[in-house]
Amino acid sequence: MNTPSNRRKFLAATSAAIAATSLPGQALGRKDKQEIIDLHQHTNYSGRNDERLLRHQKAMGIKWTVLLPAGRKFGLGAICGGNKTVRRVVVKNPKNYVHFANEIADHPECIETIETYLKKGAVGIGEQKFRVDCDSKHIERIAELAQEYNVPVLMHFEHGNYNTGIERFNKVLEKFPKVNFIGHAQTWWGNIDKNHKQEVMYPKGKVTPSGISDRLLSDYPNMFGDMSAGSGQNALIRDEAHAVDFIKRHQDKLIYGSDCNDLIGRGPSC
């Protein structure tokens, strides 16, 4: 997809959360009442079991949830389930969930593992949250696989830790124009501000437009934003006047996600 499109077309055409071939038409909003898709959740997140996750999502009014696996044990930097776990939950609840595939980016079996689960029905790759540069050969190999299977890649950008070097990510977008990338996490959302200090994870105060993320969303049709977690929320509430303009400017590029690990699906912890 080389031209900007609305959120619904993005989901249908690129599987950027849900592949059109994987879900019935109503999941793409073809009913009178549009259904909510949550791009970003995890299984066994901080010990939350499958039943509680399902209740959590229903409490939030979510119809379809994208489950993001950790890859092999100790991957992702979060306590959550891996590829086998998300696959099992999707098979058990095919009317509530779809899943991505994932693996540690620089692991020798990364591509083989991800491809195994793409063949099983994964509709994307991620959440890529591993200690590599965002323009490394490892990410390029993942992008090549994503291009082959026509699926998106969800990237967790965190300065000093994961997918480092966001200022160079434009090179990846240019090299793989047919692959849709979804930006997420502290460094992605901090960089909506032109004056962002990279070491600050949750910046406060007024935002000056034209930060790195802002420009990537504007300049590259294959760059999208995942609004989930405290980082997405912080990007909006730190400067509400800017948030209004930002959403208007990028409304066809922003995707809802929760990424919360609470048990009830409402209140300040969610």
At which residue positions do the language-model features occur?
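N-terminal secretory signal peptides and thylakoid transit peptides that target proteins
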Residues: 1-18
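N-terminal signal peptide c-region/cleavage motif recognized by signal peptidases
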Residues: 22-24
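Catalytic pocket-lining loop regions of alpha/beta-barrel enzymes
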Residues: 123-124, 136-256, 263-267
